[in-house]
Amino acid sequence: MKQEDTKQKILDKALELFSSRGYDAVSVGEIAQAVGIKAPSLYNHFPSKQAIFDALVESVAAQYTRDTDQISIHVQNAPQDIPVFTAITEDALYEKVRQIFEYSLHNETIRRFRRMMTIEQFRSPELSRLYTERYITRVALSHGKEE
């Protein structure tokens, strides 16, 4: 297995485990076992469990941004969406909302990431901020409310 393939498999298995059991309940050994490698080999790819978690957050956040940009919703910069939403028809708005909902519901990586963030927001101030930005503030702003 190539190093990049192994690295991605580590991230995939870590997300699977973190989203079902939480970060603290998962050991590096369990991640390595799920990948099919020995724990010391995992350290050739990531220096720590926290580094795996950080890479996972960065990777999935980037994927989410790329994917949502394809439907012209700029999740990192809501002001970019003002022209989109001021001139949108009701049917087009419905279609964008449907696409986002379908994507969030049926994309396994995004679904697991959202579940993991829901659990881990209480452990990490950075994740709490990211969770609040991505899921709370955006919903509040879409309803015309501010925190």
Where are the predicted features?
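N-terminal intrinsically disordered/low-complexity leader segments
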Residues: M1-D5, V75-N77
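Amphipathic alpha-helical packing segments from all-alpha helical-bundle domains
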Residues: H106, R111-T118, F122-E147
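Short, basic, alpha-helical segments at the C-terminal edge of helix-turn-helix-like DNA-binding modules
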Residues: E58-Y64, I71-S72
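Short alpha-helical functional segments enriched in proximate histidine and acidic residues
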Residues: L17, Q63, D67, Y103, ...
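Solvent-exposed, amphipathic alpha-helical segments
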Residues: K13-S20, Q99, F113-M116
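Hydrophobic alpha-helical connector segments
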Residues: A55, D69-E108
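An amphipathic alpha-helix signature
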Residues: L11, Y94, R98, A140-E147
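Helix-turn-helix
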Residues: K9, K13, L17-S59
